[in-house]
Amino acid sequence: MKIPYARLEKGSLLVASPDINQGVFARSVILLCEHSLNGSFGLILNKTLGFEISDDIFTFEKVSNHNIRFCMGGPLQANQMMLLHSCSEIPEQTLEICPSVYLGGDLPFLQEIASSESGPEINLCFGYSGWQAGQLEKEFLSNDWFLAPGNKDYVFYSEPEDLWALVLKDLGGKYASLSTVPDNLLLN
């Protein structure tokens, strides 16, 4: 019998249980960026913004990197932008979340990697998801979230609309069967 992944730590993925069926966290996959006794924060990987980014927000002379994704990182501070990237030349102000996935960077760094045609993968996340001390543990113990190991393929190369089902399938067992649960159980 395969033992389920149970590491609530930086770099883990939080996969919403099908029981979370409303709101921003419904079928969400969150990359846990920090987890400590003081609380936790992460970025939703599979929710788009639902609107186009205006030129007023993203005003770079030249954007040649086609590996840029705009995501809704979570419901908190939606006007704050966080940068996930795969750049191996890490500026000082970045943090490795899991292998080849980094959080952080300043505006000159973003401009540089956005203007490079062969630039790294970039997820620009607006807002974040946060939990107070002990809150995420309680939600996990209540089976609101499943855990999976994070990796760059999930973060950068998976289609956002397929990510929730993909991670559950990859977990196997009972999780794989949950990946086929329809959004609306009345349609089942």
Swiss-Prot record:
Which Gene3D superfamilies does its entry note? VC0467-like (3.40.1740.10)
* InterPro entries named among the record's database cross-references: AlgH-like
Any Pfam family hit:
DUF179
**Looking at the UniProt record for this protein, which Gene Ontology cellular component terms does it annotate, in alphabetical order?**
cytosol
What domain of life does the native source organism fall in? Bacteria
Give the family this protein belongs to, as stated in its UniProt record.
Belongs to the UPF0301 (AlgH) family.
Put simply, this protein is called UPF0301 protein CPn_0139/CP_0633/CPj0139/CpB0140
Give the originating organism: Chlamydia pneumoniae (Chlamydophila pneumoniae)
List the lineage, top down. Bacteria, Pseudomonadati, Chlamydiota, Chlamydiia, Chlamydiales
